[in-house]
């Protein structure tokens, strides 16, 4: 049964809140179906936006949409910038939008509220919905770059998200006694996969907005007896500062890391720490296009394979393009394809289970894979994939400036011509408020002129050399 079936685990606890409230699997199933009943009921399947807060009602609506087989949600962060949300609404014309209920949770114009709970408010489109119906087996939509509000979406089938959750259960050896805590946004594919896999195992998840540097987080984690702690590279840097070992987390049995490359010194440090406190440390690789997990390093091999992304997850396989060395993944969790507007949601399976990752790699003699570069202009910032072209366009449009964006994981570099009037402060503030990019990850440089290719396009390799 799919992880959203829920019913088979009955009286077991599925979700826990900061308040101490709990929800069993049976209660979650009833709540999910009840909330889904407040979505538009008609002869065709619908598309909706779920601003995915970390609360019972938002999780229940997500599961209710999956259980219905009729409603396809796009998962979005609850704090998405209004301009980014408006752009997405214009492109995809959702039939419904589910927001939070706080003062910052206003719904775009053209929608009327139909139902509200403590955690969510459901709004329906006022005008007649578009005739384009999302085609089965499409079950879920995710943004390719949530922080910039990219309008390019990943189309995932029901099989993709369920098979990936089952594979994660298998290699992490999750069971009914496991308990995770929400250290990541649930709209982010890594955060979503933690929720999905624990539900697939009949385990439980503690929902909180607290951060790893918060005393309340650690008090909640301790009293909830969590068994796993997950994060992206920037969060593992926080975890180092927070001092995991002195937190007395005796119930902890695993640490899991994804969302970008963790530096080798930090990998060594956390491998040594995990051995000392008696838990396992999993370093993993994935992409939203694979729902999202692709590979992992077995903890027992991490010391010997420190720079590796590991081996393919159960049910999947990895290979290299013989010409370009691009990493190619095959598996049932590969997306159906991309979408850039409402009409694309009626598209067929364009990928046929094959994903060209855009990463360049190599394979060692034992079959472990390593990344050596990228074909595409993407970086990871605080675990979120950022499209450099999107950021560059947003900045150029906002400030009417001649500029270019380059970078590496955990570092975005903005290069402007010296004559640009825009200030560094204005750029950092724009990136913080519009793209949710932490100012400390941004480097701003000015040059007399920017390099261009013969056909008039910005020369990114030359720009990168300028920054060395």
Where do the language-model regions lie?
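Conserved pre-ATP/AMP-binding loop-to-beta segment of ANL
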Residues: 6-11, 118-143, 150, 173-179
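Gly/Ser/Thr-rich phosphate-binding loop
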Residues: 226-231, 240-303, 317
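Conserved ATP-binding/catalytic segment of the ANL
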Residues: 326-389, 397
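Conserved AMP-binding/adenylate-forming
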Residues: 37-79, 183-184, 385
